């Protein structure tokens, strides 16, 4: 067994390694043991505390244990050992590492039962299987992915994977956590074009997917330093059976075409109980990074740029324009954001809440520099607030920066431009014509109104609403009903008479009161609301 010195000193206290199956545990100083298996380097350590790099608190390697002569590992394709990647954090590196600890406190250590055993014969077999699939699918994946990534659906509600035998439906299984499930019936490559997430599978498998926020797991001031950069969405992925998944393709918005980005900077961040574990992807393609024989966790692409490197990172980006109709003064919102389908969907949803309508525009043709400032201007000399937008990444769900301007009744076309602040280079322009707004307004469905729904379905609600106790409490809490009005409804003798008394009382209070009533009914009897909405289609 080859030995190699690591920069970390081993703990002076020896702990008994966890017992696995019937194997006997041995007390060893395992911090210096490295076992080479093919191209993989497995660091064996008897304490996960040894694997936390003291300067950053980040775990670069999963815990492993030794029983008899067998090495067990947790991650089948783990990141390089601490020795191999410690050059990212040299002792004279003065970058602000301390705020980047991500609370990676090693209190939740893995037990031996959490670490699957893999014999050398099994590894050889798995490698052969993976190689066969990759050799058959790789050419298809590479050529097709480059095409499909330019055609990613902007509609995130497109809940289908494109597979080798056609489309595969994605099922929403938990709306509160935004969690989805999909069953891949056969081996092959599958792509969810609405998100850019892809899988290469060996056999049929069920995959569950949820979407996370970087800001909930690490401090986003990372991206304001030149050393770190969020490179794509965050996905929480599980699979059953796990071994059926040969590759995961994680989307990123980093531009590789200019040759300014070193693919060795790409890391996959896994968020686990013990902290953040970093893994190098097997390869990096123009629109996604590949994990082979992956472990499953909350994961996403993170760039670690070598210390002292001074350059701007080019990324693919989107310009999103929304207009808010008004008879006297039409308002526009303009966003400049990284090309992230999940981020676009979040902005769409937020704008839709305020009846904003997105205009169809093309993105910037060339990559833009992350962290650079850009100036928004227009041909009509309309006041833009703010004029300057900084191209940065904010997780979906956070407040996104945008520029706003008013165009009156807009009887003439408006030319919009975005220029790079430092050099004055034009990076994007478009023309918005009055007819564009008319076409969008004609094709867009009218905004949904809870008040209108209650009015249109008065008779159905009067006949079908059930127990009103919770609804009455909601209306009183929101100051729609007084205590006396609530008692008047409750004094009615029959269910339908109570319903009629409530509906009539709230309708007299206006649309805002009806909106509150609709929200309450939707939360307490969603099936009734869903049924009535279907009847109205």
Swiss-Prot record:
Please describe, based on the UniProt annotation, the reported consequence of changing residue 394 to E.
Does not affect autocatalytic cleavage; does not affect interaction with DPP9; impaired interaction with the C-terminal fragment of CARD8 in the ternary complex
Per the UniProt entry, the effect of residue 252 to A is: Severe loss of autocatalytic cleavage
Q: What class of enzyme is it?
A: hydrolase
Domain annotation FIIND: ranges? 161-446
Keywords of the record: Cytoplasm, Disease variant, Host-virus interaction, Hydrolase, Immunity, Inflammasome, Inflammatory response, Innate immunity, Necrosis, Nucleus, Protease, Ubl conjugation
Q: What does the UniProt record report as the effect of altering residue 60 to A in this chain?
A: Abolished cleavage by HIV-1 protease, leading to prevent formation of the CARD8 inflammasome and subsequent pyroptosis
Q: Which PROSITE patterns match?
A: CARD (PS50209), FIIND (PS51830)
Tissues with expression: High expression in lung, ovary, testis and placenta. Lower expression in heart, kidney and liver. Also expressed in spleen, lymph node and bone marrow.
Q: What is the effect of changing residue 51 to A?
A: Does not affect cleavage by HIV-1 protease
List localization entries: Cytoplasm; Nucleus
Q: Where is this region: UPA?
A: 297-446
Q: What is the effect of changing residue 296 to H?
A: Severe loss of autocatalytic cleavage
Q: Which residues form a coiled coil?
A: none
What's the name of its gene? Answer: CARD8
Domain-level remarks: The disordered region is required for activation of the CARD8 inflammasome.
Give all residue intervals belonging to the CARD domain. 446-536
Enzyme Commission identifier(s): 3.4.-.-
GO CC terms for this protein?
CARD8 inflammasome complex; cytoplasm; cytosol; NLRP3 inflammasome complex; nucleoplasm; nucleus; protein-containing complex
InterPro entries this protein is in? CARD, DEATH-like_dom_sf, FIIND_dom, NLRP_Inflammasome
What's the name of the protein?
A: Caspase recruitment domain-containing protein 8
Give start-end positions of Basic and acidic residues composition bias: 1-23
Record the organism: Homo sapiens
């Amino acid at each position: 067994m080859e030995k190699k010195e690591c920069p970390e000193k081993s703990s002076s206290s020896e702990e008994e390694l966890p017992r696995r199956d019937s194997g006997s545990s041995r007390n060893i100083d395992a911090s210096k043991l490295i076992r080479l298996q093919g191209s993989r380097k497995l660091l064996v350590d008897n304490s996960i505390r040894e694997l936390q790099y003291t300067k950053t608190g980040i775990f670069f390697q999963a815990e492993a244990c030794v029983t008899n002569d067998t090495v067990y590992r947790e991650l089948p394709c783990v990141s390089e050992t601490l020795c191999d990647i410690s050059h990212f954090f040299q002792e004279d590196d003065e970058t602000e590492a301390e705020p980047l600890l991500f609370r990676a406190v090693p209190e939740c250590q893995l037990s031996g039962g959490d670490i699957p055993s893999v014999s050398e014969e099994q590894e050889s077999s798995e490698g052969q299987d993976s190689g066969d699939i990759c050799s058959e699918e790789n050419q298809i994946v590479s050529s097709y992915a480059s095409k499909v990534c330019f055609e990613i659906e902007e509609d995130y509600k497109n809940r289908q994977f494109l597979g080798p035998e056609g489309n595969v439906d994605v099922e929403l299984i938990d709306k509160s956590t935004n969690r989805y499930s999909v069953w891949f019936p056969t081996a092959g490559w599958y792509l969810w074009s609405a998100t850019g997430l892809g899988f290469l599978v060996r056999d049929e498998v069920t995959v569950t997917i949820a979407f996370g926020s970087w800001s909930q797991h690490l401090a986003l001031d990372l991206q304001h330093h030149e050393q770190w950069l969020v490179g794509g969405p965050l996905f929480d992925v599980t699979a059953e059976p796990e071994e059926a998944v040969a590759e995961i393709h994680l989307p990123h918005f980093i531009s590789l075409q200019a040759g300014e980005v070193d693919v060795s900077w790409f890391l996959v961040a896994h968020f686990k109980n013990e902290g953040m574990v970093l893994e190098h992807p097997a390869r990096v393609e123009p629109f996604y990074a590949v994990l082979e024989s992956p472990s499953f966790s909350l994961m996403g692409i993170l760039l670690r740029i070598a210390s002292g490197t001074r350059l701007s990172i080019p990324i693919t980006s989107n310009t999103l324009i929304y207009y808010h109709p008004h008879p006297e003064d039409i308002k526009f919102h303009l966003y400049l954001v990284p090309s992230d389908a999940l981020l676009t969907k979040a902005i769409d949803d937020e704008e839709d809440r305020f009846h904003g309508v997105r205009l169809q525009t093309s993105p910037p043709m060339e990559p833009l520099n992350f962290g650079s400032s850009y100036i928004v201007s227009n041909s009509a000399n309309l006041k833009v607030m703010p004029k300057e937008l900084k191209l940065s990444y904010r997780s979906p769900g956070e407040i996104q920066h945008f520029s706003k301007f008013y165009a009156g009744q807009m009887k003439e076309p408006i030319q919009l431009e975005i220029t790079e602040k430092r050099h004055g280079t034009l990076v994007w322009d478009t023309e918005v014509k009055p007819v564009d707004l008319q076409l969008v307004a004609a094709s867009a469905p009218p905004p949904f109104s809870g008040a209108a729904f209650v009015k249109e379905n008065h008779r159905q609600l009067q006949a079908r609403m059930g127990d009103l106790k919770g609804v009455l409490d909601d209306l009183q809490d929101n100051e729609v009903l007084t205590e006396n009005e609530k008692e008047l409804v409750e004094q009615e003798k029959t269910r339908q008479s109570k319903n009629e008394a409530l509906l009539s009382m709230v309708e007299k209070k206006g649309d805002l009161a009806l909106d509150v009533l609709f929200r309450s009914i939707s939360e307490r009897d969603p099936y009734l609301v869903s049924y009535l909405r279907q009847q109205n289609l």
